[in-house]
Regions:
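N-terminal ligand-binding/catalytic initiation module
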Residues: 1-128
Length: 128
């Protein structure tokens, strides 16, 4: 099997390089009541009073976006956002493995700089 065939096989097997997993236990009704409703209301109300508390009560302090429009992907050129996703996932894995930072790929279907900047600005409340 060639390196290219092996890479395709592994990417198909993995079906993506990253996943989202829970950091809190959800084994009992009490766990659910604390992590979701009604307990989730308390940090929401505190953050509503002071948005900086979102860094304390959420994963925002350790979550970054890896953003691309797919126009300049690792020497592959303009391959588009969907085709750039494997590279963005790979970058997210590097953030986690070598820096302990949770990263999430955002692949935008636009080459318009203003649209990209606006999209990132609109998403900023989710990332640190």
């Amino acid at each position: 099997m060639s390196n290219k065939e092996f890479a395709l096989k592994k990417h198909e097997e993995w079906a993506g390089k990253i996943s989202v997993e829970s950091r809190c236990p959800l084994k009992t009704r009490e766990d659910l009541a604390v992590a979701y409703t009604p307990g989730v209301a308390e940090p929401c109300l505190k953050i509503a009073e002071n948005k900086d508390l979102s860094y304390l009560y959420t994963r925002r302090s350790n979550l970054v976006a890896v953003v691309t429009d797919g126009s300049a992907v690792l020497g592959l050129g303009d391959i588009g956002p969907e085709a750039g996703m494997p590279v963005m996932e790979g970058k997210c894995v590097l953030f986690k493995q070598f820096g302990g930072v949770d990263a999430f790929p955002i692949c935008i279907r636009s080459h318009d700089v203003d649209e990209i900047v606006n999209t990132v600005a609109l998403l900023a409340g989710s990332f640190g």
